[in-house]
Amino acid sequence: FYSNAGIMYVPFSKTKEGLESTLATNYFGSTYLTLMMLDLMKNVSSSRIVQISSIAMYFIKEMRYEGLEDESIYSPWTWYNYSNLYRTMFSFELDKKITNFETDVVVAHPGVTRSRLYRRSNPSLSYKIIDKFKTNVSTGVAPVIEASTAAELEKERVYAPKIIHQYGKP
């Protein structure tokens, strides 16, 4: 099962439940779907949940758990980063807790790829610089395939493109 939800750089808005939209989509939505799938997967031999995250999680320097619905401190980039860090943390914790299942939970991120996710990005100089480092989608999907098919899994590893050596815990 691949758990992947992503919106990025969207203007501030809230869901009808009062959740900020980026966190609602990227974290709460994918977490809810993953938990709903667990019941179906628990009896499947050698099943695997691959959580798709983002290199953006590595840019969080200070954890924030409160005020995430506050428009006055909203930053599209930062909230995207938080949503991916929370998703990764959830996945690591879920993998520890479902020891009675035959299901593993792993995390992979594609690096910075040329995909439609950037269609709303800011055309500023910093984004033009980032654009120079984007890889093609086939390079980005390699860590997802590795996380999906590896015979031996490393616990709490983030599978990432080898070209940028982004491994380990965020």
Residue ranges and their predicted role:
Residues 4-10:
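Conserved NAD(P)H cofactor-binding loop of Rossmann-fold oxidoreductase domains
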Residues 1, 33, 90:
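Hydrophobic residues in the alpha-helical elements that line and stabilize the ATP-binding pocket
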Residues 21-29, 82-83, 135:
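Glycine-rich NAD(P)-binding loop of the Rossmann-fold in SDR/ketoreductase-type enzymes
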Residues 6, 49, 54-64, 68-170:
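NAD(P)H-dependent oxidoreductase Rossmann-fold/reductase module
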Residues 2, 23, 50:
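N-terminal Rossmann-like NAD(P) cofactor-binding module of classical short-chain dehydrogenase/reductase
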Residues 11-15, 44, 61-63, 118-119:
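Conserved catalytic-core motifs of eukaryotic protein kinase domains, centered on the activation segment
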Residues 10-25, 72-75:
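Short alpha-helical oligomerization interface
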Residues 25-46, 57-62, 95-96:
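Amphipathic alpha-helical dimer-interface segment in Rossmann-like NAD(P)H-dependent oxidoreductases
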